[in-house]
C-alpha cells in the first residue's frame, strides 16, 4: 500500500495572509448586506443641504412624534417620541443615540382605534435651558426633566383634559410659556422655570386666554407655537385661525359654519411681565393659517402657514414684529415646526403638508427667498438644528406597511433611514459654527 504524502508545511506569514483575506471577504459581505442610509429623493447631491447620516431609535418603530429641540451647549437633540412614550436624546456631536427618558402617555388612539389621537398623546412640545428639559404630555401636564439625573423630577398640571403642547423659554430660562392648544377655548400657561438653578422650583404663574372677539368658544380654534423675540422682549405666538379675518362684508368661516375654514390666522404678542392683561397685541395675518413660529434675524419671525389650517395656503410668512410688515416665501407651505439656525443663516421648515409631498424647506435668513426643498417621509413635520455644528435633524416615520395609519406612504423615509423602522435624518449644512 502506498503511503499518503503530507502537505508541505506553510510559513506563518502565508497563514496570516490567508486569514486576513477571509476576514476581508467576510467584512465586505457584511457591509454589503447592511442597509445604506441617505439614498433616494431625500438625499440629493446637488443641494447645499446634504444628508449626512440617519440615526436609528431603539424600541418601537416610529409612528408618531411631535416637536424637537436642540441644546447646542450640551450637544443634544431632543425628540418628543410618542411611539416610545418618551423624549429621545441624540448626541449631536457624534450623531449617536444616547437614551430615551420615559414616563409619558405615549400613543393614544382615536375611538375607532384606527389612528393616533394627537390631542391626548404625548410627549408633545419640548424645550430646554441648561440641564433642564421641559416637555408637554397628553394628559395636560408639564414634565420637568433634570438631564443630569436623566429622569422626570416634577409633573405640573395645567388643569385641562388634553395635551400640553408647544412651548418656549426666555433666554435666561426663567420663564416658560406653554399652550393647551386642544382645549376649547385654548389657553396658555406662564410658568416660573428653573433658569440655571440646581434644584427644581417650577410653578404656574398665570393662565392666559385670548379675547372671544378673536377666539370664540365652541368652534375648535387653537393656539400653537410660542417663540421668544429679543427685539421686543415678548413672546410671539402663532394662532391658526381667528374670527373675522378678513373682516369683509361676506365674512369668513372660522368654524362656525360647515365646510372648509376660510378665515386666516394671527400672531399674539404676549408680555410676560404683565400678568393682568398679558396679550398685548393680536396681529392678523394675510391668507396664512400658521402652526410653527421661530425667531429669526432683524426682528423677524417666521410662521409656518399650512393648508391644514386654511385651504389654499401656498406660502410661508416672515413677519417683522416691530413694523408688522411681512413677506411671503413662495412655493413653500404646510409646515408644523419651523426653526432658524443662526450658524447657517437659514430657516428650516418641517413641511409635511406641502402640496406635492412633504419636504424640508430651506429659506435664506437675509433675503427670505426659498433656497431648496428636499423630499421627506410623508409625516415629517418636525425639525431642529444645531447652530454650533450646523446640522439639521429631521425625524422620519416608519412606512405605513409597518406601523399603519400615520406611517410613511412613500419610499422616501426608508431611503433616508436605510431601513423600515423610521429614524432621525441628519443633514449637514454650510455655515459658521464653533465645531
Role assignments for model-derived ranges:
Residues 1-14:
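N-terminal secretory signal peptides that target proteins for export/translocation
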Residues 2, 18-19, 157:
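N-terminal leader/targeting segments
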Residues 12, 16-26:
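Hydrophobic helical h-region of N-terminal Sec-dependent signal peptides
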Residues 28-30:
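N-terminal signal peptide c-region/cleavage motif recognized by signal peptidases
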Residues 33-435:
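Predominantly soluble domains enriched in secretory-pathway, periplasmic, or organellar proteins
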Amino acid at each position: 500500500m502506498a503511503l499518503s504524502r503530507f502537505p508541505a508545511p506553510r510559513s506563518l506569514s502565508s497563514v496570516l495572509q490567508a486569514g486576513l483575506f477571509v476576514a476581508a471577504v467576510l467584512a465586505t459581505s457584511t457591509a454589503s448586506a447592511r442597509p445604506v442610509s441617505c439614498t433616494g429623493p431625500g438625499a440629493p447631491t446637488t443641494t447645499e443641504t446634504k444628508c449626512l447620516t440617519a440615526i436609528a431609535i431603539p424600541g418601537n418603530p416610529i409612528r408618531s412624534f411631535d416637536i424637537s429641540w436642540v441644546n447646542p451647549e450640551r450637544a443634544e437633540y431632543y425628540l418628543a417620541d410618542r411611539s416610545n412614550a418618551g423624549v429621545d436624546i441624540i448626541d449631536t456631536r457624534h450623531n449617536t443615540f444616547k437614551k430615551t427618558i420615559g414616563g409619558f402617555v405615549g400613543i393614544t388612539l382615536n375611538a375607532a382605534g384606527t389612528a393616533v389621537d394627537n390631542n391626548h398623546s404625548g410627549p408633545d412640545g419640548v424645550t430646554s435651558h441648561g440641564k433642564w428639559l421641559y416637555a408637554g404630555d397628553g394628559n395636560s401636564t408639564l414634565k420637568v426633566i433634570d438631564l443630569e439625573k436623566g429622569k422626570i423630577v416634577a409633573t405640573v398640571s395645567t388643569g385641562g383634559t388634553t395635551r400640553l403642547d408647544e412651548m418656549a423659554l426666555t433666554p435666561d430660562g426663567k420663564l416658560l410659556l406653554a399652550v393647551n392648544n386642544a382645549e376649547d377655548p385654548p389657553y396658555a400657561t406662564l410658568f416660573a422655570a428653573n433658569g440655571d438653578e440646581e434644584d427644581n422650583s417650577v410653578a404656574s404663574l398665570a393662565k392666559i386666554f385670548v379675547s372671544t372677539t378673536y377666539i370664540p368658544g365652541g368652534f375648535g380654534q387653537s393656539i400653537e407655537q410660542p417663540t421668544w423675540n429679543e427685539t421686543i422682549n415678548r413672546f410671539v405666538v402663532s394662532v391658526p385661525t381667528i374670527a373675522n379675518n378678513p373682516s369683509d362684508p361676506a365674512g369668513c368661516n372660522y368654524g362656525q359654519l360647515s365646510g372648509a375654514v376660510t378665515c386666516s390666522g394671527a400672531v399674539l404678542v404676549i408680555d410676560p411681565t404683565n400678568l393682568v392683561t398679558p396679550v398685548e397685541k393680536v396681529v392678523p395675518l394675510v391668507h396664512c393659517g400658521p402652526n410653527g413660529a421661530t425667531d429669526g434675524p432683524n426682528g423677524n419671525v417666521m410662521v409656518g402657514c399650512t393648508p391644514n389650517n386654511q385651504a389654499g395656503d401656498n406660502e410661508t410668512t416672515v413677519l417683522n414684529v416691530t413694523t408688522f410688515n411681512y413677506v411671503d416665501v413662495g412655493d413653500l407651505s404646510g409646515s408644523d415646526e419651523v426653526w432658524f439656525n443662526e450658524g447657517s443663516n437659514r430657516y428650516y421648515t418641517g413641511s409635511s403638508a406641502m402640496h406635492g409631498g412633504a419636504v424640508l424647506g430651506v429659506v435664506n435668513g437675509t433675503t427670505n427667498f426659498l433656497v431648496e426643498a428636499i423630499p421627506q417621509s410623508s409625516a415629517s413635520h418636525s425639525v431642529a438644528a444645531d447652530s454650533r455644528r450646523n446640522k439639521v435633524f429631521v425625524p422620519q416615520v416608519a412606512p405605513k406597511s409597518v406601523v399603519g395609519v400615520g406611517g410613511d406612504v412613500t419610499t422616501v423615509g426608508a431611503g433616508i433611514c436605510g431601513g423600515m423602522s423610521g429614524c432621525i435624518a441628519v443633514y449637514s449644512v454650510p455655515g459658521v459654527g464653533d465645531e
